[in-house]
Amino acid sequence: MKSVEEQLALIKRGADELLVEAELVEKLKRGQPLRIKAGFDPTAPDLHLGHTVLINKLRQFQDLGHQIIFLIGDFTGMIGDPSGKSATRPPLTREQVLDYAETYKSQVFKILDPAKTEVAFNSTWMDQLSPADFIRLSSQYTVARMLERDDFDKRYKSNQSIAIHEFLYPLVQGYDSVALKADVELGGTDQKFNLLMGRELQRAYGQEPQCILTMPLLEGLDGVKKMSKSLGNYVGIQEAPGIMYSKLVSIPDSLMWRYFELLSFRSMEEIDGLKADCEAGANPRDIKIKLAEELVARFHGEEAAANAHRSAGNRMKEGELPDDLPELSVAAAEDMPISAVLNKAGLVKNAAVARDLLASGGVRIDGEVVDRSFVFKLGTTHVCQAGKKAFGRVTLVSEESSN
């Protein structure tokens, strides 16, 4: 096992906050594997790269020799996490949650070593709690303290309803740490309240409190809003290799180091070397290619990554993609047909030309030929090619934010 200092450096890489660092140092000094917990509510069937920020951190703990607990919130998933939500989330059925959980497992083991991963379901202990146990759990926290949460506070002050079961969510997540005897819990920055709940409940149940490590929410392809499937600015880990590759090669230069730090398994020394190369005049696109190849290989294999790179090279030969793509913005109130976006971005003379190019296969989005059915999602960014000479990295921004 690495020294405490070496472990701490890797643990803190890319992290937003570590609470409490001195406590974690003491735990590491014992020289025993720690129990590292991260919970995921399977509320959708597939994962994107934003979800993998936590999973990557779990892998780093795993490589350091610690015990990883991948917690599937099949019980909490039926409640729905209220964190950051302005309204009550519709609950899922147990069947939906379990179906999604199976797809999660197949995806996360592309990152985690299944032989060294403990998979747990929080229904295992939550289903065993008696009404008296639930009353005891609920008595550990007050409504006033719950309303200190920013999202609950905003909803309460704006007279929006808060269902009683939503108050249970952070209590159940916190109790998971009690049931698992977690030493460390990972979560996004939006989960801090819930993670701290775990510390408080562990104390209440006579356990040593866990340390918490919050990780930032990964920005989407637009480099502004967090990665989200609903915003369309995401890279799905089950997307076709060519699509994943083209999306990653097309990210803004300003975003690539963030992605390297949070998504790459390269050492920080190697990443610093790539930064130095870039500052010395290396083409940023060549650096992004390294990132794209690494991530495509992780989820699809080395051969698929090589094929994606080769296909992208062939596409470039057909219509050379310039190194200095112009950054273009189009304001809109809602999603927009690709023909209208090309016209407003100035990549075609008029909408009629756009329609002709689309009909003849002359329009590529992120390297892939598209037709007139392609819809540009509000808030997303794509590399657009109209014909052989018109290129641009186009972002569809809301009219409100452009004012």
UniProtKB/Swiss-Prot annotation:
Would the keyword Cytoplasm turn up in this protein's UniProt record?
A: yes
HAMAP family reported in the protein's UniProt record: Tyr_tRNA_synth_type2
User: Which reaction is catalysed here?
Assistant: tRNA(Tyr) + L-tyrosine + ATP = L-tyrosyl-tRNA(Tyr) + AMP + diphosphate + H(+)
Question: What Pfam families has UniProt attached to this entry?
Answer: S4, tRNA-synt_1b
| Short motif ('HIGH' region): ranges | 42-51
Quick one: a GO cellular component term? cytosol
Q: Record's SUPFAM superfamilies?
A: Alpha-L RNA-binding motif, Nucleotidylyl transferase
Q: Name one GO biological process term.
A: tyrosyl-tRNA aminoacylation
Q: Where in the cell is it found?
A: Cytoplasm
**Molecular functions per Gene Ontology:** ATP binding; RNA binding; tyrosine-tRNA ligase activity
> Motif 'KMSKS' region at which residues?
226-230
> Mind telling me what this protein is named?
Tyrosine--tRNA ligase
Stored PANTHER family = TYROSINE--TRNA LIGASE, TYROSYL-TRNA SYNTHETASE
Subunit structure, as described in the record: Homodimer.
Give the record's family classification: Belongs to the class-I aminoacyl-tRNA synthetase family. TyrS type 2 subfamily.
Name the domain of life.
Answer: Bacteria
Question: From what organism does this protein derive?
Answer: Pseudomonas syringae pv. syringae (strain B728a)
